[in-house]
């Protein structure tokens, strides 16, 4: 997507910092530096007080002295992490220079960084700015993710509505038109036939569009559930070939099926795999010149079986091959009978085949057409 | 199709009833009854005793599964084919467990619907064609 609103630039003014130190002078120094930067500061002079102030002040960052009477900095930090979990503000420990062990223990206790005393104001400001920015980015990202999932849910709901409220009437329109074309309510005049065929073709392409959008939505939402069953590839392919012949006959295109003596059996979701076969055959019909021959081949070897669809079409130009199998990857090829294309069909095929751990691919056959093939693992 | 029995078609959407009934007539089935909802379907079923019921799954008030249960209570041997649009495996399994003979995607092209119906009729009425005069 090109026009998503850019996240706002990071403005850290007014961010809240809790400074904890039993040494009042230290607190005054650090408070001075940070207020100057536009942060809001709260102070606590012990671990116990820090826990209380934290609850009321809800800081974006905590500066925590390690050595304090009462509970020390590490314990305070662990308590904060335990109480607030993921939502706990980042903690930066303040420690005397040279106490390398403190640094390690600080990280163990859940600190994100440390500052050595005596302070160098520039270092304090830079480190705090880094952590506050990081934290703000994380928050923004969380917000964005939440907004996006909400938007995605709305999209899914909308598409669900399309499913029921558009698909059913569209299939009725298409079915009624087809029946009238077959003279189910009496013989039609030439002009009536032409009109009814227009209605049929228009409803057919709308239905296909709605179906493909729905498929993409379902697959993207991770709802592609496979109901696998042992299936004969030859039988599956034969069914699709049979049903596609009518469509092909309109363009005087013939579909021939070539099968080996073997009858490979694969574990597939029949409805979904039939969709793949249908799609590849219908593409072949769509892009082949009128009167050509489409060959559907069932093949198998030791550990894989599948099928291939060959056509006499123009093939796919090399510079467009990367677009095949991608969402909305429409190519420059134009259907030879004015059919419609959403550019989603092959992307859906790829997703279905990959969900079966299979491969789908394409090759040009020496200037005389295209071949799409699907290969599926044989059950061991 | 040489099915001479009667079929009751239950769907809340008028255009679906129009489409399927025209398809049935086109396939040579002349005795077609229609009901727009579950409760009318049960009343009509009791009156006309159709040989086969084509029953929509998604209907307001009394859905297809409830209607199926009620029909099976009236006649446990009645042949019911569920009409679905998006095939929902779970619903279909439930329907089959409740005694449905098959399911048909009503968003399929006429030829496919006809074929699915013929398969069901072949498997459910192997021995004697209902409504057929004994030879």
Feature names for model-found ranges:
Chain B
Residues 48-54:
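Active-site beta3 strand of CheY-like receiver
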Residues 53, 80, 103-104:
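Two-component signal transduction core modules
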